[in-house]
A protein has these predicted regions:
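A short, conserved beta-strand element in the Rossmann-like catalytic core
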Residues: 92-94, 121, 148-151, 178
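Short, well-formed alpha-helical segments that are part of the catalytic scaffolds
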Residues: 40-43, 65-78
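Acidic donor-diphosphate engagement hotspot in glycosyltransferases and nucleotidyltransferases
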Residues: 72, 97, 152-157
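Long helical/loop segments within the catalytic core of UDP-sugar-dependent glycosyltransferases
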Residues: 31, 108-129, 133-135, 139, ...
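Short beta-strand-to-loop acidic/aromatic patch adjacent to the donor-nucleotide binding site
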Residues: 139-150
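Cell-envelope/extracellular polymer assembly enzymes that use nucleotide-activated donors
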Residues: 54-57, 85
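N-terminal membrane-anchoring/stem segments of glycan-assembly enzymes
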Residues: 1-50
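Acidic donor-binding segment of Leloir-type glycosyltransferases
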Residues: 73-119
């Protein structure tokens, strides 16, 4: 049996690689463990939440997403929350979104919708839609989500609002992917989870750097 031997250079490279691996593993362990510790503290009642439920404006920017609006918007409109409005900014006029939103407004008086002008071609239409939603809002606290997202329950808005305090500037949430079959779906779901854990971990460490609109 032939034994493997390493010269000095190889030993140094091997030691350096092992050290970097350990540092990287400890880095991710400390970062992601913050999420676990936070979740455990919430379950044990060790986290203070606001008892007030301030009025909230929910803003949804939708670009020709009639099917998503049909599937998810009612779940947002029917949240168990004392005072809130839902503002949908419709970007595009090639589907039935406008007709559907107009119909829903007759049933839900707290729903309001507007549109992005077709002449707006040289700026980010998503940013413009969000700006229009903010300008149309009546309340100080703003909640952003997307037409493709569906709340897990009618308590979604309450769970967000309990974090609204005088010391809070931004509340970050997590939006997962529905379970599905296939390697590609699992890869997308994993990437989404990994990204979310990273920005939530940094936020809990006091260094927030990003969030997503879902």
């Amino acid at each position: 049996m032939e034994a493997f031997t390493f010269d000095t250079t190889e030993q140094i490279l091997l030691a350096a690689t092992g050290t970097l691996f350990i540092i990287q593993a400890l880095y991710y362990l400390c970062l992601y463990n913050r999420i676990h510790l936070r979740s455990r503290a919430v379950k044990r009642g060790n986290v203070h939440f606001s008892q007030e439920l301030p009025p909230v404006s929910v803003i949804i920017c939708a670009r020709e997403e009639c099917e998503n609006l049909r599937r998810n918007l009612k779940a947002v409109l029917e949240q168990d929350y004392p005072q809130f409005e839902v503002i949908v900014i419709n970007d595009g006029n090639t589907d039935e979104s406008e007709d559907y939103l107009t119909l829903l407004e007759e049933k839900y008086p707290h729903l309001y919708h507007s549109f992005v002008p077709d002449s707006s071609r040289y700026i980010s239409r998503k940013k413009l839609a969000a700006t229009l939603g903010v300008k149309a809002s009546k309340y100080d606290w703003l909640v952003f989500t997307e037409a493709s997202c569906c709340p897990q329950s009618n308590q979604w808005l309450r769970l967000l609002a309990r974090n609204f305090t005088s010391r809070t500037q931004v509340v970050l949430g997590y939006s997962g992917y529905e379970r599905g079959k296939g390697w590609l779906h699992k890869r997308v779901a994993f990437d989404n989870l990994f990204t979310s854990m990273r920005y939530l971990g940094f936020a809990l460490a006091g260094s927030p750097y990003m969030g997503i609109g879902r």
